[in-house]
Amino acid sequence: NGAIGGAFIYTNEDTVSVGIVATMSEVIKQDIPVYQMLENFKNRPEIAPVIRGGKLVEYSGHVVPEGGLKMMPELVGNGVIVAGDAAMMCMNLGYTVRGMDLAIAAGQIAGKAAAQALDAGDTSKAGLQCYKTMLDDSFVMRDMKQYQNFPEFLEECPRMFNEYPEMIRDIMNPMFIVDGKPRQSMKKMAMGPVKKVG
């Protein structure tokens, strides 16, 4: 319905995961219950045939923290290491919402840091600082820093979800149409849709 968000289908070994992603503000603005948004997605002509005959085995909802680096809490304390959603390790990049990869990597790093702290006999905040150091050296914090302002950019640039994807579609379509006519140059094929968006 033109709302900021997205949907996904993940193929697993024996199951398929189907879901939607919507910001709280869009859910309120759209005035459509989240479960109805999911049903609307499942009933799309591109999706319905893929899941037809499937049996619902699990249903869940999850609020994803989009605070990112700016809202990240202290990552270590006495006897505590924080990772994943609890540490605001999530990024909305417009085309995807990342979090699972960051949580898994941070969890692995947390395990290594905890093992080091236990071996050293020091699970205090100071003894667990190696987690922060290892995390800073990993792709997790590098990516969190790289994309820390992206949520604000997305909110200020709604064209990312409508006009730009349509522009890309309009550029790509003529490249794959065989109609017996000579092809325009790539530049000419691209310029019309680009000018239309501005």
Where is each model-derived feature located?
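Active-site-proximal substrate-binding core of FAD-dependent oxidoreductases
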Residues: 90, 108-162
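Conserved FAD/dinucleotide-binding core of flavoprotein oxidoreductases
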Residues: 2-63, 98, 116, 120, ...
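An acidic- and aromatic-residue-enriched active-site/binding cleft used to recognize and process polar
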Residues: 21-23, 86, 149
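Generic structural "secondary-structure junction" signal
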Residues: 53, 66, 71, 95, ...
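C-terminal auxiliary extensions adjacent to catalytic cores
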Residues: 154-198
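A general structural signal for short secondary-structure boundary/capping elements
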Residues: 53-58, 65-67, 125-128, 176-183, ...
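FAD-binding beta-loop-beta segment adjacent to the flavin cofactor pocket
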Residues: 62-94, 136, 141-144, 159-160
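C-terminal catalytic lobe of FAD-dependent flavoproteins
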Residues: 12, 28-50, 72-93, 98-105, ...
